[in-house]
Amino acid sequence: MYVSRLLFHTIPGKTGEVEKELKKLRDMVMTAGGNHARVLHTHFASLGAADAVFEQEAPDLQTLEQQIHQLTNSQEFQSWSYRMSSLLTQSPKREVYIINE
């Protein structure tokens, strides 16, 4: 099992808007077949840490890649991405972890 995280660094004062947009992303991911998608808000972190995190689980990398491909090719995602870019100080970074239980 894998968990994918997208880290978002927001423009000051825009974290609330980013979280609303990430909830829209969550809905799009679920439509694309994603599981356990959720939005995390940074409560306390070291300097330079992301302000918001989008997280989703996938059983394997192939499934994750298929979901990402399906999502990013949609017009809805393209419009969403354009809106999001004005709320961020930098492009989001993706991290993929193996869940080791």
Which residues fall in each region the model found?
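An amphipathic, aromatic/His-enriched active-site/gating alpha helix that lines ligand/cofactor pockets
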Residues: 20-38, 57-94
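Short, well-ordered beta-strand segments in beta-rich or mixed alpha/beta enzyme
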Residues: 2-9, 38-72
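Residues that cap or initiate secondary-structure elements
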Residues: 12-14, 60-62, 100
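Short, surface-exposed ligand-recognition loops at beta-strand->loop->(often short) alpha-helix junctions
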Residues: 9-20
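Absolute protein N-terminus
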Residues: 1-2, 101
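Short, low-order "capping/linker" segments at domain edges
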Residues: 95-101
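Intrinsically disordered, low-complexity segments enriched in polar/charged residues with Gly/Pro
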Residues: 14-15, 42-44, 83-84
